[in-house]
Amino acid sequence: MGGVLRISRLTQFAVALLVGAGLPAWAVDVSPPPILQWFESSYRTVEERAADLFMAGYGFVWLPPPYRADTGDQSVGYDVYDRFDLGRPDRPTLYGTETGLRTLAKTLHRADIDLHVDFVMNHNGYSSLGTPGFVAAGGYPGLAITLPNDIDGDFHSAFAMGDQYERLAGLIDIAQEKNHRFIRSPVDPADARNIRAGQVPAFGRLANVPDPGNRRFYPDRGHGTIFVFDPRTGEANIPVHAFNLNDPTKGDPVVENATGYLMRNAQWLIQVIGIDGLRIDAAKHVQGFVLDFIDRAVYRQNPRRLLDGSQKDVFTYSEVYDANPAVLLPHVRKDINHADPGRIGGNRDTLDFKLYFALKENLESTATLGTWQTIKNAALDLADDGLHNGSAGVTFIQSHDVFKPFGLENVAQAYTLMMPGNTVVYFNGREFGNRDFPKPGRGDALSVRDGSLLTRLIEARNTHGRGNYVERWDGTDGLFAFERESSAIVLLSNRGDAGFDSRTLTQVGFAPGTLLLELTGNAADPRVNPDRGGRRDIPEVVRVFDEGGVSKVNVRFQRPGTITRDGRFDFHGKGVLVYGLATPQAPRGVELSNVAKLLPGQGEPDNDAENGRRRQTDISVITAGSFEVRLRTRPVRLLDSDALRDVWADGDQALLKLDAGRDVNGNGKVDFATPGSTAYGFERFRQKSSPLIGAGGLGAARGEGEFRQVVDASKLEEGIHFITVRAWRHRTDGGPAVFSDFKRVIYIDRLPPLSRVASIRPAGGGVDLDVRSTDGTAESVHAFVDLPAGTSEQAILAHVGQGEGRLNWVDRDLFRAHLGNLPSGPHVLTIVTFEPTGTGNIQKETVTAP
């Protein structure tokens, strides 16, 4: 590679910033943090487990389609009914509500995690012209089910044939090439341009009825307007208006065709809901021009800027169920030029089904002949430029649609995680039962309490996933090795027998004498590598040596099976080892002062369903006005052995990041704001910064290995926050940065939780009382009407302790109670609110019952 492509954080080739050494940056192949495809969990659960997502090291979360589904509220969501109905308090989707999704996006953004959703633009649901009452009910919101001059309206005929016209799995296919123009989210009932409104409800639904509230689904003409040129169509001076986030009622309805409706929905998801990326469902079944228009819809539409003020590009990636590069590559478009912002470009990739099919076929069982020769040449990444550099393809080994390679899934997962480029890990939370669809996922995707092979692989990817790909063993014997040059060596085996295989790897990218530490934990796992009377077959540390001027290293490949100490064959499937440069050690991790209490995690769950629901990470509660962050590193002796002293790993710098990057040391800025650097978003320690290896290098005076920073908690929002301290290995060889990350999750609880009455209205012979958590911290709310004057707080809390007056949770920030026989007129309402820390607050408010 000759330069750095600044595409987006997800797809860019990042620069290794050698913070301590002060050397120039080098452009190298990069493995961005992985995408977690998380299905079958509610937004509430995903938000609750944001701490685990952060600790595991995911950079992106991909959720299912958020729309109202056609077949009911238990649907996964691919059968779309209404694209602008993401769930409401009185009728959530399977996953929750629009407010819940918005809040989840904000929480993930605070953790420096991007949120992706499935974007369905090929089809709607199963209802059609033949569905009784559907036409009279208005059909689908925003799309004409039939028209006087076109019986199929905005859709293709049920008899149409071909990938881009037929009904996929019976789902009605949108005809994006048609140009029927309407106001598709109607506001004014007198506007003749409106799409036809439904007249008679069917299945409790009535579509396309004009509603002033629909203004919020439109951009505000003239607000935040940009003018762009589209090189795909040749159109110039195209006005693109922004949604008015401060006053959504200023949205301006406009006429549009079906493609325009889909474009508006994409823009709305990005700007209003807080989505950062779109996984485009069934992209093989839409015509190519549609993808270009989606590129236009999201181009420069992310209002969340990077720390240096530059544009953060929306990332899209297509599902194209095909192994042919000639079919896949046209879906890859990476031509955004930030130096020419008026020219529309795309930041689009595609899921790598070509590699998936090779992994599934060759790692379904052990000892498949030619496995590695097939796999290493299968990636779509090779098809665009002949290099394994992450320039094309989003890799995966399983998804909601397709099964994993059952025999050697760990080997397959290690391969994709340690390669350059973007990759997906799939997790099924099982919150809604053990349904056949979506398919099962990795049960250990969020096993952060004690760690798992998967989470350790993710850590290795994040800390050592920089450096160009170089093949080190060719795989003809069932063994395959590649190096992330000067960073880590990956050893993979698909052999069917037990034991290990010794090999010497030559021309490795490490200096003679360099120690390499096994990073996956397999070498230390007593099941994989049992103690055999004081020795183990697989070493935890190997040393690079020189032979004839060539750097070499002796390694042992771990086979997927082991002979136990009592002579049994044990197939564990963990034919994976990763040896990487050692990095700084801090046995106590991030130390915090002024911790008032701990919200403990719930330990390692026994199954996928529990893993989907239960937070494992401990959260430290801060109630003081400030707290100190401290890291204490120690001289690195691998395996606590003086013979394995690695002074380079002592480290020459540590930096602090709070949330996604904010000023915590009081100098008025984020110290490192260059996108793509390993220091992006981090701050210098101001109270004390004393790395073991000082600015003078190895031969100069040494520091104490201590770093301290006082953080002003009064400047932090109430609720959860995320701390990362990153400590870098000392390098003078120009190699890519490697580091250790030390993390803590905190909860700021300086102020009492606040709530207020949102509404009180007639319902079911009484009134419904809605109370909103105005600061978003409430876990439970109780309400009492007209308590006697002078009722003490102790007496109120006694009522609460008996479970009295508890409101039902109906939305992320909304609680409801039905009050029967409440006389009309004024009443004094006593509201008691608790947040997850146990902190409570008693408030009084006068309301008027209807």
For the regions a protein language model found, what residue spans apply to each?
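Surface-exposed, short loops/turns at beta-strand junctions within beta-sandwich domains
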Residues: A713-I720, L819-P826
